[in-house]
């Protein structure tokens, strides 16, 4: 079988878990995906099967869109909800203040990848190194943020979309 399959990746599956499952279903070794989604993320994952796997690196699958809930004033050791809360403080912001702050991140920025991310350094995923208790030097990487939109706002939690 040759072609592109658009899969909805469930939370707690890695992108490689999806590829491994499809390799078993299709009895095909040549399967790749169009961009890593972190294990806690769910969403669309383009998968390239058979001869199409060669096109995987040629197609622009780098642009992603995230919809996420967030709570201001809370920090965890993993920088997401899967980690142990390390700090929690009261914050009081209006929706306009949050929207104005988000606007400062739109455009071309340099981002240091967090230790709990799927970015690879020397062939190892940062989140694997972090789980081993290791921290490595990470170089800032150019990232383009096209838009950030606050979708839902209440005093304690917010939902936003980032592309």
Task: Give residue spans per PLM region.
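Catalytic/RNA-binding core of pseudouridine synthases
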Residues: 1-163
């Amino acid at each position: 079988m040759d072609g592109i399959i658009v899969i909805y990746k469930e939370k707690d599956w890695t992108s490689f878990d999806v590829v491994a499952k499809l390799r078993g279903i299709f009895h095909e070794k040549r399967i790749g995906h169009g961009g890593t989604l972190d294990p806690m993320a769910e969403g669309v994952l383009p998968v390239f099967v058979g001869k199409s796997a060669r096109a995987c690196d040629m197609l622009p699958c780098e642009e992603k869109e995230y919809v996420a809930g967030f709570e201001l004033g809370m920090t965890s050791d993993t920088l997401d909800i899967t980690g142990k809360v390390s700090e929690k403080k009261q914050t009081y912001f209006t929706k306009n203040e949050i929207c104005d702050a988000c606007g400062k991140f739109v455009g071309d920025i340099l981002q240091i990848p967090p230790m709990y991310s799927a970015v690879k350094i020397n062939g190892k995923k940062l989140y694997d190194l972090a789980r081993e208790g290791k921290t490595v030097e990470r170089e800032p990487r150019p990232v383009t943020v096209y838009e950030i939109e606050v979708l839902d706002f209440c005093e304690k939690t917010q939902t936003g979309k980032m592309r």
